[in-house]
Amino acid sequence: MYKRQVYESLKLLADAGLTFDVVATKHEHMECVPIVGEKVPQLKMVIDHLAQPPFKDGTPGQWGEDMRMAAANPNVCAKISGLGTASGDWDGWTADSIRELVHWTIDLFGADRCMLGGDWPVSVLAGGYVKAITAYKQIFSERPFAAQEQISYKTAMAFYGVSLV
């Protein structure tokens, strides 16, 4: 990750107005986010699947520190997706089992830097797309309506530069 060519390539993305989805599954991936942010400050990044958060002990631990470091960069967003498969309990996960992590992330990044993702077709492995979206929407409904809209579609529209018209 520290090769000059990597940063040059990421700068090309940024210069073209494109974004970078960070598919992080461990600490070593996440520790690159602030480094990339420093080397390519104009690059917009999104952390896919909340970087596979821990579900076992209920504390943010190293994952939480990694997310705090990422959230320090205003060009980094968090994609709330893939949590059913990340939970390790593909059949038994529920909105209740992911609620705390989702709210923790929204509180950390703010609704304007969180976006909903479906993780289809992978979500099929953990109960399906409808189960995932229903669980996320149930959790988002505990937030003000403006935050629900922001997370459900407005953040993604702004981040990826798309419009409804």
Predicted feature locations:
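Active-site glycine-centered loops adjacent to acidic/histidine catalytic or metal-binding residues
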Residues: 119
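Short, active-site-adjacent cap segments at secondary-structure transitions
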Residues: 85, 122-124
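Catalytic pocket-lining loop regions of alpha/beta-barrel enzymes
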Residues: 3-115
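Mid-to-C-terminal alpha-helical segments outside catalytic/metal-binding sites
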Residues: 103-104, 108-115, 124-165
